[in-house]
């Protein structure tokens, strides 16, 4: 038997995924019908052969996307015969809650089982505010696993399984909302970050559709400026994102300031070197005039020296960026250390000395492995809250 080495397997996965994000000839496999991945007019078209009026599409859409119901039987203003037929069609596929954990800081992690048995994770982060309304952020997964194999990331270590459908992406927010409204009828997610499991730009079409569903005025109606999509540097995806007619935010997972180090920790850099990624990000800024967010995971003795800070600052000289420093989180089997507070503060001060708008990002949910780089979509080894 010819067994491929892990690096070779990762390269094959990356080549396969590359083909999916090229603007020309992107192919989407036919997906099973799931009402939560459809817009009102699409639901209406689906029901036209049943002799249903057009307004049924908007009616059902609001039940699903605004009220976050999980059962057709809950759509009480639909005719009974239609509810029965919809139920028999099997077009509503809510995520199956596998495990729920709550951190000391109030962060919640949800483990979901998909219809085919795959596991994904989502994170709910409530931020309490005294003067303004509370901010409630959900960190979303876009793939089961991830093909990019970033060395410091738990998701990358488990390999790539498949892309999530738009319904599965949207379903993470809808099913969290459904659960939370049992105790708080006014619960609402206000912000979204596509920073969970997977690379969003390797599932571009489904991410794009999900954003459209999230922002639809008859659904969750989340403001575009309250949504951030993060990429490890998929250049065609960045260019496509820049051409979108929206105000969704872009974040770049950078984590190193030179090609040698970045390729060592992020193999995707071999396909899209740093210069290409930065050129694409500059094109994004020139087209949109929207400030780029940059994520930088600090690893003790790896990329946390003052010379690293100066090199990082030089990459973005004259750019209106916001840089988040993220002291790396513990992931079993990786062997990287989180830097102490003092060198982290020195790194931050050096960046600011060179004119970079930078902060040390507040980390949430570390005690339940819900922080950056810790999501892994696994049922074993976790304790139920």
UniProtKB/Swiss-Prot annotation:
Subcellular location, principal: cytoplasm
Q: Which residues bind [4Fe-4S] cluster?
A: 146, 150, 153
| Residues covered by region (Disordered) | 1-35
* Keyword tags: 4Fe-4S, Cytoplasm, Disulfide bond, Iron, Iron-sulfur, Metal-binding, Methyltransferase, rRNA processing, S-adenosyl-L-methionine, Transferase, tRNA processing
**Family classification:** Belongs to the radical SAM superfamily. RlmN family.
Enzyme class, first EC level, given as a word:
transferase
Binding-site residues for S-adenosyl-L-methionine, renumbered to this chain: 198-199, 230, 253-255, 329
Q: Where in the cell is it found?
A: Cytoplasm
Q: What is its EC number?
A: 2.1.1.192
Q: What does this protein do?
A: Specifically methylates position 2 of adenine 2503 in 23S rRNA and position 2 of adenine 37 in tRNAs.
Q: Which CDD domains match?
A: Radical_SAM
Q: Which GO terms describe its cellular component?
A: cytoplasm
Protein name per the record: Probable dual-specificity RNA methyltransferase RlmN
Which HAMAP family does the record cross-reference, listed alphabetically?
Answer: RNA_methyltr_RlmN (MF_01849)
- Cofactor entry: [4Fe-4S] cluster
- What reaction does this catalyse? adenosine(2503) in 23S rRNA + 2 reduced [2Fe-2S]-[ferredoxin] + 2 S-adenosyl-L-methionine = 2-methyladenosine(2503) in 23S rRNA + 5'-deoxyadenosine + L-methionine + 2 oxidized [2Fe-2S]-[ferredoxin] + S-adenosyl-L-homocysteine; adenosine(37) in tRNA + 2 reduced [2Fe-2S]-[ferredoxin] + 2 S-adenosyl-L-methionine = 2-methyladenosine(37) in tRNA + 5'-deoxyadenosine + L-methionine + 2 oxidized [2Fe-2S]-[ferredoxin] + S-adenosyl-L-homocysteine
Q: Which residues cross the membrane?
A: none
Catalytic machinery residues: 121 (proton acceptor), 372 (s-methylcysteine intermediate)
Q: What is the native source organism of this protein?
A: Heliobacterium modesticaldum (strain ATCC 51547 / Ice1)
GO MF, one term, reads:
tRNA (adenine(37)-C2)-methyltransferase activity
């Amino acid at each position: 038997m010819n067994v491929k080495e892990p690096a070779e397997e990762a390269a094959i996965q990356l080549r396969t995924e590359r083909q999916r994000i090229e603007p020309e000839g992107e192919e989407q496999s036919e997906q099973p019908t799931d009402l939560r991945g459809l817009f009102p007019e699409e639901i209406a078209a689906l029901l036209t052969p049943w002799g249903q009026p057009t307004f049924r599409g908007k009616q059902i859409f609001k039940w699903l996307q605004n009220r976050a119901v999980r059962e057709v039987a809950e759509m009480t203003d639909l005719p009974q015969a239609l509810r029965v037929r919809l139920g028999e069609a099997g077009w509503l596929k809510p995520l199956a809650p596998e495990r729920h954990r709550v951190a000391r800081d109030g962060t919640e992690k949800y483990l979901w089982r998909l219809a085919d048995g795959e596991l994904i994770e989502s994170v709910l982060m409530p931020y309490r505010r005294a003067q303004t309304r509370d901010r409630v952020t959900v960190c979303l997964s876009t793939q089961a696993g991830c093909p990019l194999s970033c060395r410091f990331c738990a998701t990358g270590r488990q390999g790539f399984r498949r892309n999530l459908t738009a319904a599965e992406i949207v379903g993470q927010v809808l099913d969290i909302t459904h659960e939370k409204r049992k105790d708080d009828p006014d619960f609402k997610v206000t912000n979204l970050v596509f920073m969970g499991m997977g690379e969003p730009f390797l599932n571009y079409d489904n991410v794009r559709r999900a954003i459209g569903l999230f922002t639809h005025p008859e659904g969750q109606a989340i403001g575009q400026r309250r949504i951030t999509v993060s990429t490890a540097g998929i250049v065609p995806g960045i260019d496509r994102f820049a051409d979108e007619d929206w105000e969704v935010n872009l974040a770049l997972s950078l984590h190193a300031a030179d090609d040698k180090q970045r390729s060592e920790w992020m193999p995707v850099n071999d396909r899209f070197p740093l210069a290409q990624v930065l050129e694409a990000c500059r094109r994004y800024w020139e087209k949109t005039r929207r400030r780029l967010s940059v994520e930088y995971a600090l690893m003790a003795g790896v990329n946390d020296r003052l010379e690293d800070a100066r090199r990082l600052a030089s990459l973005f000289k004259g750019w209106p960026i916001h840089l988040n420093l993220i002291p790396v989180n513990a992931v079993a089997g990786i062997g990287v250390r989180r830097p102490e507070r003092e060198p982290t503060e020195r790194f931050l001060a050096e960046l600011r000395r060179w004119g970079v708008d930078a902060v040390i990002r507040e980390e949430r949910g570390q005690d339940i492995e819900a922080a950056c780089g810790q999501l892994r979509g696994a049922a074993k080894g976790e304790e139920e809250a």
